[in-house]
A protein has these predicted regions:
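Fe(II)/2-oxoglutarate oxygenase catalytic core
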Residues: 1-85, 91, 97-156
């Protein structure tokens, strides 16, 4: 349930390739310095590049070890719950704060998509409108039709 919301991911990000590479384990005093994943900008004609990184937290019985993400709006630091995912554009610097007790284990991977960040932002906002309109089936249906049309056109 928490680990992967298929409808949300397919609607907003339109993934065409997901790579789950490894898991990390952090114990007391472990951390991961702020860094940017070593992927180059995506050429228009080649979709083998990864657009997003993700980290899925497997345990939550530890202290510290916040997932840190530096965005254009500022830095975010959040302790992820078990099963919670942090999904972010790979161009954003990120890291893990110092674990003060317990064991932090997470799965690391990357995802590519056929659409741009800007297009994904539009689909995200349409998704939010659709979720707010679930009681009004007519509006919900119209929003879903627009989402599906845009996904089809943008994924070409």
């Amino acid at each position: 349930d928490k680990l992967y919301d298929t409808h949300f991911m397919d609607t907003v990000y339109c993934p065409n390739r997901v790579s789950v590479n490894f898991y990390n384990q952090y114990v007391k005093d472990d951390h991961y310095d702020i860094h940017v994943d070593e992927f180059k900008a995506r050429p228009k004609s080649n979709n083998t590049f990864f657009d997003y990184g993700f980290s899925v937290n497997l345990l939550d019985d530890y202290e510290g070890g916040e997932f840190i993400l530096q965005t254009p709006m500022g830095q975010i630091a959040k302790k992820l719950e078990a099963g919670e995912i942090a999904l972010f554009p790979i161009i954003y610097p990120h890291g893990v704060g110092n674990v003060t007790s317990g064991k932090r284990i997470n799965i690391i991977g990357w995802m590519s998509t056929n659409i741009s960040y800007e297009q994904s932002f539009i689909l995200y906002n349409l998704f939010q409108i659709g979720q707010a309109a679930t009681a009004d089936i007519s509006t919900f249906t119209k929003v879903n039709l627009v989402q599906n049309y845009l996904k089809k056109e943008w994924s070409k």
